[in-house]
UniProtKB/Swiss-Prot annotation:
Top-rank taxon: Viruses
One GO-annotated biological process of the protein: virion attachment to host cell
Name by which UniProt lists this protein: Structural polyprotein
Residue intervals on the Cytoplasmic side: 383-422
Amino acid sequence: SVTEHFNVYKATRPYXXXCADCGDGYFCYSPVAIEKIRDEASDGMLKIQVSAQIGLDKAGTHAHTKLRYMAGHDVQESKRDSLRVYTSAACSIHGTMGHFIVAHCPPGDYLKVSFEDADSHVKACKVQYKHNPLPVGREKFVVRPHFGVELPCTSYQLTTAPTDEEIDMHTPPDIPDRTLLSQTAGNVKITAGGRTIRYNCTWGRDNVGTTSTDKTINACKIDQCHAAVTSHDKWQFTSPFVPRADQTARKGKVHVPFPLTNVTCRVPLARAPDVTYGKKEVTLRLHPDHPTLFSYRSLGAEPHPYEEWVDKFSERIIPVTEEGXEYQWGNNPPVRLWAXLTTEGKPHGWPHEIIQYYYGLYPAATIAAVSGXSLMALLTLAATCCMLATARRKCLTPYALTPGAVVPLTLGLXXCAPRANA
């Protein structure tokens, strides 16, 4: 049961640890110090480890509505409902157990955890943390849709059952407390108040030791004494933000709840684009409801991939070759296209129809062939004209040199001979 899962905390206690910003921009020893923030989940969920213990009352008994924290040298409890997690805005807390919180948070540049103590004072810790989760899939949506498509993703499983991952617990350090010392007529009085006090004075007699009752160090001053509360009946997390105890060996362990697991996430499906097919190209009209990824690539030896985030109505023209092209719009499945060898004209029709047919299939070769044939025709025409002029001249020259000669009618017609003048 869940209560049994919390039994591992019976031998532990919360603690106060160093926090650089306790919510007001100043350093303090916070009862809700942030130890670690984990963001391995692809669905954007965070797992946060803090110094307070959630789901336990002051005595260490499982109580879902409580959290316990260290106030000075004593453990106190408060309401779990006062627990808050923030980035740029409030986070949604999905689960808590002991030192751990799992929550979904909006993007932000910091993370803050706070609660109200037994006296209704806000206790907090704030750390610099860049939270900008990548979207699941290819669409940057804000609200998970009712309908869409399920994609594989990872998330923190909301279970408090034991796992293979653990955190180390060790003996708490002695906590210095100058308020335990008071000056009385040249003597230093140590007020135990029911606690075990370790003291060390550099002056006077019987000046080093431990005591659980009030004690006076004669002929001494407060500045010459050091007093600390020592309590080793419980363990606490081995934190880098807490002074280490004299006994540094691991004393116990607590399992880390909410393991990372493979799940599916529902994501939106972008509206299908309007498609217009052209000659070796396709025109897409895109209507995104939110920033949506558009990408395409060639299916040939060189894919030349291209992608962009589209956040407003856009029109894109992509080339389609015989080797094929593939485009994908948002979370829709990819679409593959190939250019078909279609053309106009007729392969066995009139010359202009033949040229039109082959131009559609092989434009460069057709232009070269037509240009070559046209050039040959022009050269042939020029040569023919030259030969005809030469033949005419040779045919008419004898008659031109003979006085009174008459050009025969047939030759005159073939050589376009001028009429004779009287």
